[in-house]
Amino acid sequence: MVKVNIIFYSMYGHVYRMAEAVAAGAREVEGAEVGIYQVPETLPEEVLEKMGAIETKKLFAHIPVLTREMNEEVLAGADALIFGTPTRYGNMTAQMRAVLDGLGGLWNRDAFVGKVGSVFTSSGTQHGGQESTILTFHVTLLHLGMILVGLPYSEKRQTRMDEITGGSPYGVSTIAGGDGSRQPSENELAMARYQGRHVTLIAKKIAGK
């Protein structure tokens, strides 16, 4: 059995929807055990309320929150980790950064060496830092000793020119629009499923399971 966990942060639900699609793709692989977790929120509730995020976060309130006590089982215990984060100035969110910065003990034990790592993201605009967010995230995964997997061009949907779409060789992405009203398209969700399946198949081969 190959164990794959999806770890995400979402404020308005875009990354959550992508995470569910990634998980669905991973579950298509025979013998895959797939989990999905959200990272802890660091913003005060009054700030979230002003940002209009209280109601939207209820959409995925049923998803378990990854606590520090769970890091050993959920993160170090997985064969592959697929991370999802919105862009923040071309980087991951502070909420996701806080989780990764807390992995020093596991890093010191080489707990992630040889595991598969992959990333997906969202931004408000077509050129809102999607690629830089994934690439800068990759730097952390390399420091952890992980094997990077992206979204290869065998997934032809990323080359479509007839509609606005996210996605690059670095990983699948979605474009939320300046007001957040655009939800992930079927094309983007299909790419997310592809990436989830692709990562899981590679992790299964590496783990010899």
From Swiss-Prot:
Catalytic activity: a quinone + NADH + H(+) = a quinol + NAD(+); a quinone + NADPH + H(+) = a quinol + NADP(+)
Residue sites binding NAD(+) per the record: Y12
TM stretches of this protein: none
Single GO MF annotation: NAD binding
Cofactor: FMN
GO CC term (a single one): membrane
Cofactor note: Binds 1 FMN per monomer.
Protein name as annotated: NAD(P)H dehydrogenase (quinone)
Gene source species: Methanosarcina acetivorans (strain ATCC 35395 / DSM 2834 / JCM 12185 / C2A)
